[in-house]
Regions:
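Aromatic/glycine/proline-enriched transmembrane-helix motif characteristic
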Residues: 1-152
């Protein structure tokens, strides 16, 4: 049985620090994959919005969450990225969080009507829709759903 830490301890540091991309160590057993297309999407997002979501690392710069963001940063030739150090986690908790962080996000869904409204408004604002991560067919379907709702 894995040793547990105090569940109420939370993050023991909320300080975001800039860490050299060259010093970050990908988790060798990371089960999540990142296609070249997705890494380019993440890079586009970083260019448009900035690096808004820090990479989560352990005490030795091992990546716990943010492998795709680091790959995108390397593509953009960024020398440093914002990191949040999670030195309070046990080895088992780090391995589990690598999985949980990716899997739990997949359990969410979309309010398709609200999504269609937001996409329609962004489209009307002439925002670059390619930065949102939806493929062309998805955008067409969702925008036509909004057009249909407006016609009713």
């Amino acid at each position: 049985m894995a040793k547990k830490t105090d569940k109420g301890s939370g993050v023991n540091s909320t300080a975001i620090e800039q860490v050299s991309t060259a010093s970050l160590i990908p988790y060798a057993r990371n089960a999540r994959t990142h296609s070249e297309t997705q890494v380019k999407q993440i890079a586009g997002s970083i260019q448009e919005f900035g690096f808004c979501n820090p990479v989560l690392v352990d005490a030795t710069n091992g990546i716990i969450a943010g492998h795709g963001r680091v790959m995108a940063a390397q593509l953009l030739k960024l020398e440093t990225v914002p990191c949040l150090r999670l030195s309070h986690l046990t080895d088992a908790q780090k391995r589990a969080y690598v999985l949980a962080d990716n899997r739990i996000a997949l359990s969410s869904g979309w309010d398709e009507e609200m999504l269609a409204n937001e996409l329609s408004d962004l489209h009307a604002d002439e925002f670059d829709m390619a930065l949102l991560g939806f493929d062309a067919d998805e955008l067409t379907a969702l925008l036509s759903m909004e057009d249909t709702a407006e016609a009713i």
